[in-house]
Amino acid sequence: MMNPRRLPPLPSSTSSASAADDMDPRVWRRLPQPLVDRILACLPTPSFLRLRAACRRFYHLLFSSPFLHSHLLLSPHLPFFAFVVPAAGHLLLLDPTATASWSRLPLPLPPVAGGPAAFSPAAASAGLLAFLSDASGHKTLLLANPITRLLAALPISPTPRLSPTVGLAAGPTSIIAVVAGDDLVSPFAVKNISADTFVADAASVPPSGFWAPSSLLPRLSSLDPRAGMAFASGRFYCMSSSPFAVLVFDVAENVWSKVQPPMRRFLRSPALVELGGGREGAARVALVSAVEKSRLSVPRSVRLWTLRGGGGGGGGGAWTEVARMPPEVHAQFAAAEGGRGFECAAHGDYVVLAPRGPVAQAPTSALVFDSRRDEWRWAPPCPYVVVAHHGGAGAAGFRVFAYEPRLATPAIGLLDATAPVALHGMHDG
């Protein structure tokens, strides 16, 4: 049994004035219990985790299917970002809103005695984080809910690979995972030939999911597993380099195609992200990249484009530049980045860019772009930089993903999930 005193409150994104208002117990005692449950279901996940220590009944709501279903439907969307340092044993969560703050959440991965982590962060979707096995060969993909510490593994991937690129799209009752590239054609050689797609849906047979027939990647594809994939309108998008191109995978058709990116000769550290979406509308695919062109008429910058009409087939789609980093902000960002590249993710209206640093350290800085307000601002320094002290394991360094803390991730129930070990709250100290 966990001790609720060990869970300091996560900084709230709401105003401090509301926190000063006390609840009148004479009112709350007289409220019908169904109404109280309805109110609790409307709370953000961090707020409910703090409140569950108030009484035993609130705690037991965590194991009530009707309550978890209501919370999934009614609780507000939280556009958090998860920074994953493979050797650190925990996530660093950034709340990018106006009162930006950091918090910490333990990772539920099983420990590996006497060696580096056997799984590395690969993707995230709908409150789930995906971790890919490091060993070459047929890959294991683990899905984890860090809040409930629920773990589930997909069936072993059918094609042996070295370091493939992973995409994940999870809904309340479905999971789609793509494992692409780095086919092991021999014990000593890899080629970007194919992709494997796993599909699980509560309405499918079997509901526990299956690996679809492999799909062929476009010729001359060169994938970077750190770049990951974006998902929108039933399609996955990922970057190919040398030269740069955007690969598009239509899940329903099981077919890949190419879309040309803007200014492809002058891109550096490009990343594809999902902008917008959530409960307010469909997500758009966006390209975030540094632009470096020798001509003085095109100064160095970081730009953001969105794609319209980027479907399958003949490589159609039009890119529209929607934002450009201001020169004074870019000067600070370029100094922090130092030519090492940057990690990038988008969640709702927010885009986070984090300069890459030393292997075993968490990010020292993060730049937040609010696309709705067209505003660039630096997040406060991460207070947990020194906690990544488990040696030099995880040579790829940290990754950043869009992450929404959720009490309920019912899609993971489609897999053979392990029982929850314990419930973890979010630590801010």
Swiss-Prot record:
Protein name: Protein ABERRANT PANICLE ORGANIZATION 1
Record-linked PANTHER family: BNACNNG10540D PROTEIN, F-BOX DOMAIN-CONTAINING PROTEIN
Domains as described in the record: The F-box is necessary for the interaction with ASK proteins.
Tissue distribution of the protein: Expressed in apical meristems and the lateral organ primordia throughout development. Expressed in seedlings, roots, leaves, shoot apical meristem (SAM), developing panicles, and, at lower levels, in developing seeds.
GO BP, sorted A to Z: cell differentiation; flower development; maintenance of meristem identity; protein ubiquitination; regulation of cell population proliferation; regulation of DNA-templated transcription; regulation of flower development; regulation of vasculature development
Effect of residue 295 to C: In PBN6; bigger peduncle diameter due to larger vascular bundles, increased number of primary rachis branches (PRBs) and of the number of grains per panicle, thus leading to increased grain yield
Subunit structure: Part of a putative SCF (ASK/Cullin/F-box) ubiquitin ligase complex. Interacts with FL/APO2.
Deletion consequences: Reduced expression of class-C genes. Several abnormal phenotypes in the vegetative and reproductive phases including accelerated leaves growth, aberrant panicle distichous phyllotaxy organization and disturbed floral organ identity. Aberrant conversion of rachis meristem to a spikelet meristem after producing several primary branch primordia. In flowers, frequent replacement of stamens with lodicules (petals), and indeterminate production of carpels. Precocious formation of spikelet meristems and prolonged formation of lodicules and carpels.
Organism whose genome encodes this protein: Oryza sativa subsp. japonica (Rice)
Topological type in the membrane: Multi-pass membrane protein
Miscellaneous comment as given in the Swiss-Prot or TrEMBL entry: Ozone has various impact on different cultivars; O.sativa subsp. japonica cv. Sasanishiki exhibits ozone-induced leaf injury, but no grain yield loss, and, by contrast, O.sativa subsp. indica cv. Habataki has grain yield loss with minimal leaf injury upon ozone treatment.
Induction record: Induced by ozone.
Function: Component of SCF(ASK-cullin-F-box) E3 ubiquitin ligase complexes, which may mediate the ubiquitination and subsequent proteasomal degradation of target proteins. Together with FL/APO2, involved in the temporal regulation of meristem identity during both vegetative and reproductive developments in an APO2-dependent manner. Promotes spikelet formation by suppressing the precocious conversion of inflorescence meristems to spikelet meristems, probably via a positive regulation of class-C floral homeotic genes, but not of class-B genes, and through the control of cell proliferation in meristems.
Superkingdom, taxonomy of origin: Eukaryota
Transmembrane segments: 72-92, 112-132
Pfam families for the chain: F-box
GO molecular function: ubiquitin-protein transferase activity
Placement of Kelch repeats on the sequence: 229-277, 284-339, 350-397
Pathway: Protein modification; protein ubiquitination
Keywords noted in UniProt: Activator, Developmental protein, Differentiation, Flowering, Kelch repeat, Membrane, Repeat, Transmembrane, Transmembrane helix, Ubl conjugation pathway
One GO term describing the cellular component: membrane
Biased composition (Pro residues): 1-11
Domain annotation F-box: ranges: 25-71
Principal place of residence: membrane
Record region (Disordered): 1-21
